[in-house]
Amino acid sequence: MSRSFMIILTIMLIALSLGEVLAAENGYDLIIVRNDDLIDYLIALPYSHLLDIPILPVNPKELDDVTKAQLYSYIQLGRDKILIIGNNNAVSLNVEKELEDMGFKVTRIGGADRTETAEKLALHFYPNGSKLVILASAWDYGSTLAASEFAMEYKCPILLTWENQLSPSALEGIKKLNPKIVILVGFGINETVEKTIEDMGYETYWIGRDIEPPPIETTTTTTPNQTSSSKSFFLGVLVTLMILSPVIVYLWKKREERRSQFLEQFSEKEIEVLRAIIENGGEIKQEELPKIVGYSRPTISRIIQDLEKKGIVEREKSGKTFIVRVIKKIKLD
């Protein structure tokens, strides 16, 4: 019996028992996310769908008059419990205070970065764990959008990871959720991430590489009303994405400009050395670099010292050599 068949069979058995998954009690009437970055909106979608509550993207610094008018109308209907997704840098304390002054009861769930925010949300809404976990790259918005759709369909949490290695938050989330299978989505994840998960003892299934879509079936029968509700929900998602798209395009261009300016500080040789380290999972023995990039040991030593001064890498003594580790998130391509 092939490994692929066993994985498919396991996923189908998990899907049949998804109704046993217990989410946190529905204590919210509205989810608030920032309107200048799509990632928090995407990781909020599965929980919005799970609890059947809307998401409102807002200015992260302060509430404008139109948003306040919407919120006043909402609270007058008795819906006064708000969940803010993201830390104070994502949605400011000023916005939180404005909401409280309007009479809302505010809860905030956020981490140091988007991977930790995703972990905290997953553990909050699935305190008893989940037999299925969706994993996507924190920097590949397309894959995260697809991952959110799968998480909504299968009623399971979503975690985010770094591209070249499993993020500490995703690792902890997987351990605490203790799933039967971790489903990886998209091409923005390195195979070292999958290997790390498998070495932890979990089955993996890679949508976009193994089978697309996965053969997962649920026992829930969709009624006409459910179908209509689902269509309305996804229409709302589509409209929101259309509204946000000009902002996203602008931010993407600005990000690319900043990235280009950032990369200009590095020489061609420094970029080659950085690429070699990143492709090795973010750290490597210094003695291995000359063979990989083709530069002499003195040249490698000088490059590493320069990268240390720029705060990009750090070195740790290991026997007669050094372990060189990338300490700053950097995207070369």
Curated annotation (Swiss-Prot):
UniProt key word Signal: yes
Repeat in keyword set: no
Signal peptide positions on this chain: 1-23
Membrane-spanning intervals of the chain: 232-252
Pfam families assigned to the protein according to its UniProt record, in alphabetical order: CW_binding_2, DUF7343
Mode of membrane association: Single-pass membrane protein
Gene3D superfamilies named among the record's database cross-references: Winged helix-like DNA-binding domain superfamily/Winged helix DNA-binding domain
One Gene Ontology cellular component annotation held by this UniProt entry: membrane
UniProt keywords, alphabetically: Membrane, Signal, Transmembrane, Transmembrane helix
Subcellular location per the Swiss-Prot or TrEMBL entry: Membrane
Name the record gives this protein: Uncharacterized protein PYRAB14350
Organism of this sequence: Pyrococcus abyssi (strain GE5 / Orsay)
